[in-house]
Structure formats: C-alpha cells, structure tokens
C-alpha cells in the first residue's frame, strides 16, 4: 500500500522538495529554470535528468522477461542423471535443500525443473509467474513424480514418448489438490521450498546456507592432478579461455569487495539492516531508493582508472586467447580497459547505463555519477514534468545493475551454453563463488578442462585443479613474467620478484616481495 509524505515527494520551489523528518530518501535540491509551468513548478531542475534520445544497445544490462529461452532450452542429460541419482540416495528433501538458495531467480527455478526432466509445458507461463509460484511448481512436480528415482531422458514438447509422461498429466498434477502420500514429507518439503523474494535475514545465515550447498555438491569426480608448470604451458597454447571474475580484481583501486572484513557488507553494518544485502534488493529499492544511494558511491568506479588485472584480461583478448570474460562486477572497468563488448558478459549489469523505474527511459550512466557521489536519488525529468506529488520511488533512476530478485541477462545464459562447448581453460579470479548462478558455472565445465582459481582465499571442494592464492594483480604479474608477456599497465614491472610457497595440497601462495626499477 502506498502512503504519502513520508512516502511521497512533492514539487516545491521549482523542483523536488527536500525530505521531511520522516522521509528517508534524498532527492537533489532544485534550482528554478526558465520555462516553468506554473507557480511552484518547473519543467527542468537540477537533479532531474532527461532520458537519452537515441537507442542504446543494452544487451549486457537489461533483464529477460519474455521467457523465450524455454522454447530453445535443451536439458543437460548428464546433470539430470546426477540430480536423479542424488535424489535416489539422499531423498527429495535433501535435494531441495541443496539446490534451492535464497539468491535463485525465476529463470534458475525453470532451468532446475527442465534439467530434472520435466516438460517445458510445466513452466510455459514463466514470464507471469512469481518466484514462489515457480518454486511450488517444482515442489508439486517432485511430489507427484512416480518415476522420481529413475533417471529420465530428455523431454521435448513434440516427443513425450521418451519417458511415457504426458504434458497434460503434468498439468493435471500441478493443478490437482489430491492428498499427498505422506503429510509429514510434504510439510518438510514445503519448509525446504520456502522461497521468498527477500534474502536471508543475515549474511552469516546466507553464507552458511551456501557453504552447506557447496559441501553437498561434491558429487563431481575428483579433479585430475595439475601443476603450476602445466598452467604456464596451457596459458601459452590456449585459444578459448573462459574467465570468471569478481570484486577481488578491483580492490586495488579502492573499490571494496563484498564479504571480507573490510568489504562492503561489513561497512553497511552502520545502516542497521537485518541483512546488508537488502541494499541490492529490488523490492527494497522500490520502497526506499535512497537507501541504495547512501552506499552507491562506495562501488562507483574511479575516473580514468582500471587495475592491472583488467589489463591482463585485455592482454588475453589481444593475444586472441580470451573466449569470454563473465564478470560479476558492476564497475564496467573491463570496457574501460579495452575489452570488446562481444568478449564481455556483465552477469550482474553495470553502471554503464541507468533506467527510470517508472517510464523505463534509458540514460547514460555518467549522467547520474554526480548524484551518486552526493548520495542523492536521481529522478527522471520526463516523469516529473507535470507531476506535483507521487510515491517516493516515482521517477527514480536505477543503474542497470541486476539486483537480488531480478533475472540475469538472457545473454548470460545464451553465451554460456555455447562457450562451455569450446572452452580449453577455465580461470576464476577474485571471487568467493557465493552468488548463484555464477557460483555453479564450474560444475558445468567439462571434466577435461583445467580449472584454476586465482584468489586471496582458497575455495575448497569446488573441483579446482589448481589454486593460486594471493593478490590477483600479483599472481597474474608472476604468470606473465614466466611467459615473458608484458602487461600494458603502469603497475606491471618485469623486474618484480616473487615469493612462492607450496601448500600441502599442491596449491601455491604467490606474493610480490620487491619492485625494481623498470628497464
């Protein structure tokens, strides 16, 4: 239910009024300009922004709402066998507790349903269903699946004879109110499927859930032996390297990561939120856009800079080795470093563009940078042109960042399916792999492809063949020194020396110990 002041913004003295004592969002204060439409209102003010008057390619940023991916989706039969085998050993309840996380999107639920072997017809209404509705479709499908313990073959809308399942039967199962065989099991499954659009109540609970999920996903084969010289050799020969990056590649620029002691979530503790991640929750933004803008300046990219690691990615591209960089970062520094748009997938969107939540107008990201630095809510001038009073979120402009509760861009899923068939080396750099669906990419990488982690902290039980621990910039500097590659960045020095410490499990810790004068 919408309430007005304190949940309202008024137009006074030529623009957006400053907040009353009970308002939490801060819009830019205004200065009257020529062309006012009447006493106390104007058509343009500071803090008001006009949408970009031309079309912009925002494939990296906008979300997919049309559900077309269902028509072309092909279930992963190997994954389906693993799922069914796991259910047979551990039970449906354990499976749901393992696979369902608070960060899952609607699309993730659909993919899980289809990879379990259920027909596409069961999720054909995906675009208009809520997250919770899709979760309960999955629940009912599993509860009414008499062949649950037997691996199924791929089900296609035009070929339902493969497993003897009829789409209309599935629909009937979903819509029926028939009694379940076991009320206690049903209740437990309901608890396991208690999916809400909000996140966990605190970060510790969320991380604990993810850790449990990680441990239960050790159903993959043991990684083959792989040594540091093997990586040096593979970097030299590889032509299709997939790189997954996270916040750790930007920390050298002063941009905080999310989960370390000095990370963003720790800094957000002063906001007295039950869950710091709610700052990046879509429903929270619609209720209180000012909350996001109190912290957005912390993750705003610095002007004109990018890290040595970003330059390393550009080097892989220039050497025709980079298949794709899947970044979880929203700072858009990959493109600043020179990565081509076709080589980059911004899994969680970016600050490159912004969008009005009311009229869907698109803006160049730079237009709201000053508002972000001033902790102000930017507002759409078009929406406010003839408006005197509206809900607090009306005309608010949001960066094209994928918030919790939003689907990832369709481009992520389309290219991922294609890239996994070509990849010859898999690098994960600067991420703890805590957020789905990016966290599960490694599980889809073919077994024969070497999987390398470059990160400050280790990630156990995820199938990495080799883990190189240290600052991301230092580790890639060492690798490039071994390869006699020059990284085009001011912080790279061929004369740097490194200390290597071999760990008991065969992984390495790499630390830069000195810097000499460049030749």
Curated annotation (Swiss-Prot):
Per the record, which residues fall in region Disordered?
154-212
* One CC-aspect GO term: nucleus
Which cofactors are required for activity?
Zn(2+)
Q: What happens when the gene is disrupted?
A: Leads to high frequency phenotypic switching, spontaneous hyphal growth, and decreased replicative lifespan. Shows also oxidatively damaged proteins even distribution between mother and daughter cells during division.
- The highest taxon in the source lineage is Eukaryota
* Molecular function terms, GO-annotated: histone H4K16 deacetylase activity, NAD-dependent; metal ion binding; NAD+ binding
Compositionally biased tracts (Acidic residues): 187-208
What InterPro entries would the database entry show? DHS-like_NAD/FAD-binding_dom (IPR029035), NAD-dep_sirtuin_deacylases (IPR050134), Sirtuin (IPR003000), Sirtuin_cat_small_dom_sf (IPR026591), Ssirtuin_cat_dom (IPR026590)
Metal-binding listed as a keyword = yes
**Location(s), subcellular:** Nucleus
The UniProt annotation places Zn(2+) binding at 356, 359, 380, 383
Q: Where is the Deacetylase sirtuin-type domain?
A: 221-486
Offer one example of a GO biological process linked to this entry: cellular response to oxygen levels
Sites binding NAD(+) sit at 246-265, 328-331, 430-432, 455-457, 472
Alphabetized Pfam families for the sequence: SIR2
Q: Does the keyword ATP-binding apply?
A: no
Q: Which reaction does it catalyse?
A: N(6)-acetyl-L-lysyl-[protein] + NAD(+) + H2O = 2''-O-acetyl-ADP-D-ribose + nicotinamide + L-lysyl-[protein]
Q: How is the cofactor bound?
A: Binds 1 zinc ion per subunit.
Q: What conditions trigger expression of this protein?
A: Expression is up-regulated and increases progressively with hyphal development. Expression is inhibited by 2-dodecanol and decreased by allicin and fluconazole.
Question: Which EC numbers characterise this protein's activity in its record?
Answer: 2.3.1.286
Under the subunit heading, UniProt states: Interacts with HXK1.
As for family, the record states: Belongs to the sirtuin family. Class I subfamily.
Q: What is its biological role?
A: NAD-dependent deacetylase. Heterochromatin component that silences transcription at silent mating loci, telomeres and the ribosomal DNA, and that also suppresses recombination in the rDNA and extends replicative life span. It acts as a NAD-dependent histone deacetylase, which deacetylates 'Lys-9' and 'Lys-14' of Histone H3 and 'Lys-16' of Histone H4. Functions in the distribution of oxidatively damaged proteins during cell division. Mediates phenotypic switching.
Q: What is this protein called?
A: NAD-dependent histone deacetylase SIR2
């Amino acid at each position: 239910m919408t309430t007005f002041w304190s949940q309202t913004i008024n137009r006074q003295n030529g623009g957006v009024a400053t907040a009353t004592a009970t308002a939490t969002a801060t819009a830019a204060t205004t200065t009257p300009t020529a062309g006012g439409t009447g006493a106390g209102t104007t058509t343009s003010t500071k803090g008001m922004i006009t949408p970009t008057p031309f079309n912009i390619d925002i494939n990296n940023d906008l979300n997919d709402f049309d559900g077309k991916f269902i028509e072309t989706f092909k279930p992963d039969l190997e994954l389906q066998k693993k799922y069914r085998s796991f259910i047979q050993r551990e039970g449906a309840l354990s499976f749901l507790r393992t696979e369902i996380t608070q960060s899952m999107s609607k699309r993730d639920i659909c993919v899980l349903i289809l990879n379990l072997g259920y027909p596409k017809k069961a999720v054909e209404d995906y675009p208009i269903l809520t997250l919770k509705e899709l979760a309960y479709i999955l629940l009912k499908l599993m509860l009414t699946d008499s062949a649950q313990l037997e691996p199924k073959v791929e089900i296609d809308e035009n070929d339902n004879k493969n497993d003897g399942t009829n789409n209309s039967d599935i629909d009937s199962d979903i819509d029926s109110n028939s009694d379940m065989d076991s009320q206690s099991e049903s209740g437990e499954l309901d608890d396991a499927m208690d999916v809400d659009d909000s996140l966990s109540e605190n970060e510790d609970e969320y991380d604990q859930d993810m850790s449990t999920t990680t441990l239960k996903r050790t159903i993959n084969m043991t990684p083959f032996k792989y040594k540091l010289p093997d990586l040096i050799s593979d970097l030299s020969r590889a032509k299709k390297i997939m790189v997954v990056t996270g916040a750790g590649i930007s920390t050298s620029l002063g941009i905080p990561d999310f989960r370390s002691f000095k990370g963003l979530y720790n800094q957000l503790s002063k906001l007295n939120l039950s869950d710091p991640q709610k700052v990046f929750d879509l429903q929270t933004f619609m209720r209180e856009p000012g909350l996001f803008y109190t912290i957005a300046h912390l993750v705003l990219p610095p002007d004109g800079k990018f890290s040595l690691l970003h330059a390393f990615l550009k080097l892989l591209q220039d050497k025709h080795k980079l298949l794709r960089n899947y970044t979880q970062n929203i700072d858009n520094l990959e493109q600043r470093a020179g990565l081509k748009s076709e080589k980059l997938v911004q899994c969680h969107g970016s600050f490159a563009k912004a969008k009005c939540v009311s009229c869907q107008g698109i803006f160049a990201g730079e237009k709201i940078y000053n508002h972000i630095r001033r902790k102000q809510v930017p507002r759409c001038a078009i929406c406010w042109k003839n408006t005197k009073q509206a809900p607090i979120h009306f005309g608010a402009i949001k960066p094209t960042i994928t918030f919790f509760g939003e689907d990832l861009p369709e481009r992520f899923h389309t290219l991922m399916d294609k890239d996994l068939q070509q990849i010859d080396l898999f690098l994960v750099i600067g991420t703890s792999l805590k957020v789905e669906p990016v966290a599960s990419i490694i599980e889809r990488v073919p077994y024969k492809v070497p999987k390398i982690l470059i990160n400050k902290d280790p990630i156990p039980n995820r199938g990495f063949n080799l883990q190189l621990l240290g600052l991301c910039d230092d580790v890639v500097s060492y690798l490039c020194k071994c390869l006699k590659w020059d990284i085009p960045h001011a912080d790279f020095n061929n004369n740097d020396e490194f200390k290597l410490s071999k760990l008991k499990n065969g992984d390495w810790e790499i630390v830069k110990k000195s810097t000499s004068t460049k030749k």
